[in-house]
């Protein structure tokens, strides 16, 4: 989540120089092997263990997340509109800011993020569960999606409305931030891994994670180093990773899968030590439970900053400082929201 906030600072409030800086590109490249892939993998993994794993439950979750996406877009637009016009009232309109305002407003109303992807993936999982697809079917589907993704992104239409649908499904033009079809691979593999780990006896899970984490960690390093060698400059490496992050091919899926299993293994290994550190463990549990709220809110905070700043092009140092401020502000907003909702629930009782 911390890395996401830093990257989004460059993607929302940075000037052209900062957005093209090596700092942004390196941050993005380091985040790329996991990031949204890890989130979707964990979603598939968690669907194995949740009590709400029936197809109807998944449909309900999927629809709810799609509604969240729409509400988030409206809230982001409201943040831009309100903050931009407050700025105009205070200082007058900044030259050239109106065009940036209109472009960014259109962007936040039409782009899709992790909520849309998760919602669509839940609906697909519901279909698979309803059809009682075997475990091998999930693996085959993950491979097929990884093979097809580089080709399906070529589906582009001259019709703006149709192209928007194609873009957020397959990722052709890259104007909607994310697209859901290529990410199905991670959801399918997460589901498969959840089924596998469920069959491993509790007293053997440590050894299982140790072996699988070691093998997958080595493969992930080889893959990542191979990507660097085959794209030997920061710019080429960033461009390649950007394309692969949005519309991952089979090799990227395999590399990220190995990186994610390594992360799972490390987390399993260090968790007993983390549990002894009560403050850190409680914070980790808090962020795990509230990550969706933090993800949704921090983007709105960035757009509020952008609007109030009249879309001033911040430099690298300023983006990094704003990222820290947004992290703190987001945490405070989520805590405030939780206190208010808890108070309302208590009063109802």
Residue ranges of predicted features:
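Alpha-helical transmembrane segments and their immediate juxtamembrane cytosolic regions
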Residues: 1-349
